[in-house]
Amino acid sequence: MKETIQGTGSWGPEPPGPGTTYSNPRRERLRWPLPPKPRLKSGGGFGPDPGSGTTVPTRRLPAPRPSFDASASEEEEEEEEEDEEEVAAWRLPPRWGQLGASQRSRALRPSHRKTCSQRRRRAMRAFQMLLYSKSTSLTFHWKLWGRHRGRRRNLAHPKNHLSPQEGGATPQVPSPCCRFDSPRGLPPPRLGLLGALMAEDGMRGSPPVPSGPPMEEDGLRWTPKSPLDPDSGLLSCTLPNGFGGLSGPEGERSLAPPDASILISNVCSIGDHVAQELFQSSDLGIAEEADRTGEKAGQHSPLREEHVTCVQSILDEFLQTYGSLIPLSTDEVVEKLEDIFQQEFSTPSRKSLVLQLIQSYQRMPGNAMVRGFRVSYKRHVLTMDDLGTLYGQNWLNDQVMNMYGDLVMDTVPEKVHFFNSFFYDKLRTKGYDGVKRWTKNVDIFNKELLLIPIHLEVHWSLISVDVRRRTITYFDSQRTLNRRCPKHIAKYLQAEAVKKDRLDFHQGWKGYFKMNVARQNNDSDCGAFVLQYCKHLALSQPFSFTQQDMPKLRRQIYKELCHCKLTV
């Protein structure tokens, strides 16, 4: 509630009313007397004369509008209207309308100095907006026009200020089910690969592709014509950044397109012949593109929706088979697409698009790996943590090494025997007594090849024993000379020959170091090299792999472990 100063000097004569007395003119809150009860009408065809117990509802006449001084300016009259509306919004008692018009206008009208200062401030604010505002020409006039409340009234609905009984528009009441906060519903369903790509484009803020047909707004139709057509309105419209365009033939300014939110930083003009060459050349390029054969254009065009759907189905099947996309390569997906659609997908553009699809699929929630995925083979159980060691440049663990060694041994069981990766560590620490029961069911001297993985601290190496030739060969991808390992294996073979009564194998063992093998160039691929040594020795294949083949060989090892079978 607004506080004023009670007194004769400010408010004029006191309003008439019984029992209305004010003490000394001090600053206090307004205390209005109770309004007198209106007299009821009777007679004139309105029914019987009401008595003491009869109440007839009547309509209260609106208070007369106050008269304004002839000397008041037009702006002061608008300010007085705004002040009266503000006072009406304060819900003052009805006796406020019974005061004299001159008293209310004198009480509400600000001083001459205050009016001048307000006008000066508004003029300076409008001038600053004109100089420094970055808004367009359309929005500037809207801001300047919106200073006056009477001009902001919607002209399309002139009866909005009337009540519904007087013929005005019915107020828009929100539905009881309407809520003004964003509802928290169920989480959105899992998007497919195509939906994820569209969502990523929306997150990047890529602008939508214009559709080109004519545009309609507020009943006016703006149809884009040829760029060189002077009647199209494009050369005579008002530019969105405030620059005026060329006028029409009759001096009238044409309408601007509905999308006036684009700011043009540089405006230049070109000759008609240059513009014609530009647009004609583009039209010729489009015609030449359309003249291409459908088969050739289809082979080199970007991926279509059915291609994206096929890629997603391939990735889904791959994820269920291998638990992750670690052993997947782009070439493999491209080959499957070529087999299905009988088209060329190995072009650089299409191949890069396939790679982007794979990366987008991996970023989707739940597609990194299948939780709970396991591979069981005999006594071996591989989890995703074990299989994850084959990704990138991770170090292989004992579980992967031992299961792959068993796969090698089971591929040629009569020829090869593979020792567990913990065998050498137990032999080195506890001697023959610690490992003498490891081969109680196997006569190793009936085999052709013995494979013994060696794990020293953080490095993998391999010892291969040719039983017939009685040779012990040490394979190391870092080409280190470790003489202790062959000696420990030679002592074990002698002790095993004595225990198994194979005295012909007690003597004649020789040790070698294999130096002309593929060498690793990092600190993480030693385990993958050892597995390839085992496979190629067991299958009697030459060492044709190098360091550059390790990413592909890691993916191949992953698949062989999941299928529990070597790729021969």
From Swiss-Prot:
Residues 380-537 are annotated as: Protease. The modification Phosphothreonine is found at residue 170. The active site is at residues 459, 476, 526. It is found in: Nucleus, Nucleolus; Nucleus, Nucleoplasm; Cytoplasm. One of its GO terms (cellular component) is nucleolus. It comes from the Eukaryota. Its EC number is 3.4.22.-. The modification Phosphoserine is found at residues 52, 71, 73, 163, 175, 182, 206, 226. Residues 1-119, 155-174 are annotated as: Disordered. GO terms for molecular function: cysteine-type deubiquitinase activity; deSUMOylase activity. Component of some MLL1/MLL complex, at least composed of the core components KMT2A/MLL1, ASH2L, HCFC1/HCF1, WDR5 and RBBP5, as well as the facultative components BACC1, CHD8, E2F6, HSP70, INO80C, KANSL1, LAS1L, MAX, MCRS1, MGA, MYST1/MOF, PELP1, PHF20, PRP31, RING2, RUVB1/TIP49A, RUVB2/TIP49B, SENP3, TAF1, TAF4, TAF6, TAF7, TAF9 and TEX10. Interacts with EP300, NPM1 and CDCA8. Component of the 5FMC complex, at least composed of PELP1, LAS1L, TEX10, WDR18 and SENP3; the complex interacts with methylated CHTOP and ZNF148. Interacts with NOL9. Interacts with CCAR2. Protease that releases SUMO2 and SUMO3 monomers from sumoylated substrates, but has only weak activity against SUMO1 conjugates. Deconjugates SUMO2 from MEF2D, which increases its transcriptional activation capability. Deconjugates SUMO2 and SUMO3 from CDCA8. Redox sensor that, when redistributed into nucleoplasm, can act as an effector to enhance HIF1A transcriptional activity by desumoylating EP300. Required for rRNA processing through deconjugation of SUMO2 and SUMO3 from nucleophosmin, NPM1. Plays a role in the regulation of sumoylation status of ZNF148. This is Sentrin-specific protease 3. It comes from Mus musculus (Mouse).
